Every structure is written in structure tokens, then in C-alpha cells.
Amino acid sequence: MESGAYGAANAGGSFDLRRFLSQPQVVTRLVSMVLALIVFSCIFGEGYTNIHTSDQLYCVFNQNEDACRYGSAIGVLAFLASAFFLVVDAFFSQISNATDRKYLVIGDLLFSALWTFLWFVGFCFLTNQWAATKPQDVRVGADSARAAITFSFFSIFSWGVLASLAYQRYKAGVDAFIQNYVDPTPDPNTAYASYPSASVENYQQPPFTQNVETTEGYQPPPVY
């Protein structure tokens, strides 16, 4: 992890494209974008077909419109969300407020965890509907249907990795906050430092003073 709050460099640095593209969450997010693009493109392109006795288009997944709607919806939203968080990753190091960084990382964590679950549901749903589809009802789009199912399966892992990376950044930010703002507990075994001994300074007679000598006895007055 880079130094700084929530896994990013301190604010104020210049943007480094090579360093940005080498970040694990950026690479995984780009992969997730490509997978989502393939899924909804397959459904939009060849996810609807007609049967022999009708010209009306039906969803290729067992003629279940909900299957096509669900697969295309999570694919489009996953693509848009990946693009949004990719922009956030690009400008994340320019955000100086640690609270704003925390909320963005939490949003990334929650969304990635939710979409991991939704991709799992989508994979199971599409697989179930495809298994129930009659081969004679599929004139075109069989390969696209299989591709949508396959890349839905891969999306489960890509979004799971994104959730894990977001959690690591969140934990790094919390640990840094604790180290910086919580006073450490003193060690009872550590001896207290001794106070320096007071130095005794010799008394010095102040300047511009005369010694007053006192003599005992009578002194005769001067004779003129």
C-alpha cells in the first residue's frame, strides 16, 4: 500500500499514469468493465430470438424476459459503476480530506460486495434458465447466451477481488488513524527519567558595592 490515508499517496502530488494503471484495483476494475460489457452486449445483441411459429421476439433464456432484463441490467450498471470508480481512483490522491476518502472507500466496498452477490445470483439464474431452454426454440444466439453465462461467472471473482481490495484500503486508513490520534499507553516497566540535580551556585557579591567595615572602639576626630 502507498503511504497516505486509505491506501493512496498524500494529496498534492502529480498524476502518474503508469503508477495509476499498475494499481491492483485499477487493473481489476478494467477487467470488470470488459466482462460487464461482454455480458450485456451478448444479451442486447443476440439475447432475443423468435420461434418457428411466430415472428415475435422472446428471450433466449427459456423465453423468460426477466432473465434477459436481469442480466442486461446488472451488466450495464456494473459497467457504469466501474467507470465511475475508475474516475474516483484517478483523482483519489488529489482528495485531501480524509473523511471524504473514507466515504468513497466505504462506497466502493459496499457496491463491490453487493455486485459480487448480484453476479452470483445472475449466473445461477441464467444457467438455470438456459438449462430449461428447448434446443428447437433457439434459432440464433446460443453462443451469445453461453458467453453471457461464462462471463457472469468470471464477474463474480473480479468483483469479489474489488471488494477485498476496498476492504484492505479501508482497514489501512483506520489503522493509520488509530496510530496518529490515539495516545500510546505508557509501559509500566519503563523507569521514569530522573530529574537533574539542582546545582548550588556560589554567592557572588554584586558589582559596584563597597565593603562596609565596622570597627569597634573610639576613633579621635581629625586634627586641623
Curated annotation (Swiss-Prot):
UniProt domain MARVEL: residue ranges: 20-171
Subcellular localization(s) per the UniProt record: Cytoplasmic vesicle membrane; Cytoplasmic vesicle, Secretory vesicle, Synaptic vesicle membrane
GO biological process, one term: regulated exocytosis
PTM per Swiss-Prot/TrEMBL: May be tyrosine phosphorylated by Src.
Nucleotide-binding found in the keyword field: no
Domain of life from the UniProt record: Eukaryota
Main location as per UniProt: membrane
Membrane topology: Multi-pass membrane protein
Gene Ontology CC: synaptic vesicle; synaptic vesicle membrane
Annotated positions of the N-acetylmethionine modification: M1
Keywords: Acetylation, Cytoplasmic vesicle, Membrane, Phosphoprotein, Synapse, Transmembrane, Transmembrane helix
InterPro entries: Marvel, Synaptogyrin
Modified residue annotations for Phosphoserine: S3
Signal sequence annotation: none
Transmembrane segments: 31-51, 72-92, 105-125, 147-167
UniProt similarity note: Belongs to the synaptogyrin family.
Function: May play a role in regulated exocytosis. In neuronal cells, modulates the localization of synaptophysin/SYP into synaptic-like microvesicles and may therefore play a role in the formation and/or the maturation of this vesicles. May also play a role in GLUT4 storage and transport to the plasma membrane.
Protein name as annotated: Synaptogyrin-2
Source organism of this protein record: Mus musculus (Mouse)
Gene: Syngr2
